């Protein structure tokens, strides 16, 4: 999980 990939993934998880 990259820094830029972690942002959208975290938003999709919520």
Curated annotation (Swiss-Prot):
Cellular localisation: Secreted, Cell wall
Where is it chiefly localized?
Answer: secreted
Gene Ontology CC annotations of this record? extracellular region
Q: Which UniProt keywords apply?
A: Cell wall, Secreted
Protein name from the UniProt record: 44 kDa cell wall protein
What is the organism of origin for this protein?
Solanum lycopersicum
